From Swiss-Prot:
It is found in: Cytoplasm. Its main location: cytoplasm. Methylated by PrmC. Methylation increases the termination efficiency of RF2. Belongs to the prokaryotic/mitochondrial release factor family. PANTHER family: CLASS I PEPTIDE CHAIN RELEASE FACTOR, PEPTIDE CHAIN RELEASE FACTOR 2. One of its GO terms (molecular function) is translation release factor activity, codon specific. The gene is prfB. Peptide chain release factor 2 directs the termination of translation in response to the peptide chain termination codons UGA and UAA. Keywords: Cytoplasm, Methylation, Protein biosynthesis. This is Peptide chain release factor 2. It comes from Tolumonas auensis (strain DSM 9187 / NBRC 110442 / TA 4). It comes from the Bacteria. The modification N5-methylglutamine is found at Q252.
Length: 365
């Protein structure tokens, strides 16, 4: 005979946690708003304003993910309880194992939804950009920056965030000097915001004929894409705009014609670049959008006394602002903020970052 009580206890706990989430996440208000948004999207005239229609579509998707998940959890718990009853009545072990599997799947959905409660920041639901910059150290540091770029591209692809290489500047011999990735999808900024900081690599360098250990640094800076209606005053006189030929390491992702655009905001020395379109005009628009988003995020960071000052975040590519250490010849990667550690270095470099990101979010970084 099979053990029924553990499954029934799990279902009871799942139902209680679902009810708590129903309150925390304002289920009733979201369901009502979902009906309003869906009704508006059914009106033909809404498509006369493509930007508004797009914003409503995005809002509907976010609302559906909460409302539908809570509905699935509520109905699912009842369905599994019925499966357990049928299994007991018919002494059917196969049906009972099906109930156990369903209960485990429901628990995973619930844990995912509970985790998303941590995405309560103003821009957590937004798309985002990540700037990657190699530190001092020449070819070794530039190769490390390229490895970090690949790691985040892999992470983004695995999570359905459609990573797009906006800009990429080749290293002198190998690797890259800098790159910008755009991540598009729900809660992209929420997931990646704690990845801002310095990544430290220790390894026997393939570029050193003596095979000596080298330490290299690379910084990542994450900032959300902001809505067009957010007012960011940028004086055109404060901008320097340069046009150049794209020369990135992005292969087919990066355009090679002389239409790449670099914009420098002189008062803050903030730089954005775009080279992924054949149109100089489109690249300039994209670079301006990035600049606006970057200046906004930097202003938010300045206003938040709990965060590091902009100068520390941007200029100290060294020991002080490290977030993670990658010691490859010792097969050890450790997050210096949360203490999370793994010896599966290749998996992490292939984009398996969730254990680190989840721990940093849970610790409130």
């Amino acid at each position: 005979m099979f053990e029924v009580n553990p499954v029934l206890n799990k279902l009871k706990e799942l139902s209680e946690r679902t009810e708590l989430l129903r309150g925390y996440l304002d289920y009733d208000a979201k369901k009502e708003r979902l009906e309003e948004v869906s009704a508006e999207l059914e009106q033909p005239e809404v498509w006369n304003e493509p930007e508004r229609a797009q914003a409503l579509g995005k809002e509907r998707s976010a609302l559906e993910s909460v409302v539908a998940t809570i509905d699935v959890l509520t109905q699912g718990a009842e369905d599994v309880e019925m499966l357990v009853s049928l299994a007991v009545e018919g002494e059917d072990e196969e049906t009972f194992h099906e109930a156990e599997t369903e209960a485990d799947a429901l628990e995973k959905k619930l844990v995912d939804l509970e985790f998303r409660r941590m995405f309560s920041g103003q821009h957590d639901a937004s798309d985002c950009y990540m700037d990657i910059q190699s530190g001092s150290g020449g070819t070794e540091a530039q190769d490390w920056a390229d490895m970090v770029l690949r790691m985040y591209l892999r992470w983004g692809e695995a999570h359905g965030y459609k990573p797009e290489l906006i800009e990429c500047s080749d290293g002198d011999v190998a690797g890259i000097k800098s790159a910008t990735i755009k991540f598009t999808g729900e809660y992209a900024f929420g997931w990646l915001r704690t990845e801002t900081g310095v990544h430290r690599l220790v390894r026997k360098s393939p570029f050193d004929s003596g095979g000596r250990r080298h330490t290299s640094f690379c910084s990542a800076f994450v900032y959300p894409e902001i809505d067009e209606d957010v007012e960011i005053e940028i004086n055109p006189a404060d901008l320097r705009i340069d046009v150049y030929r794209a020369s990135g390491a992005g292969g087919q992702h990066v355009n090679r014609t002389e239409s790449a655009v670099r914009i420098t905001h002189i008062p803050t020395n903030t730089v954005t670049q775009c080279q992924n379109d054949r149109s100089q005009h489109k690249n300039k628009d994209q670079a301006m959008k990035q600049l606006k988003a970057k200046l906004y995020e930097l202003e938010m960071m300045k206003q938040n006394a709990e965060k590091q000052a902009l100068e520390e975040t941007k200029s100290d590519i060294g020991w002080g602002s490290q977030i993670r250490s990658y010691v490859l010849d010792d097969s050890r990667i450790k997050d210096l903020r949360t203490g999370v550690e793994t010896r599966n270095t290749q998996s992490v470099l292939d984009g398996d970052l969730d254990k680190f990101i989840e721990a940093s979010l849970k610790s409130g970084l």
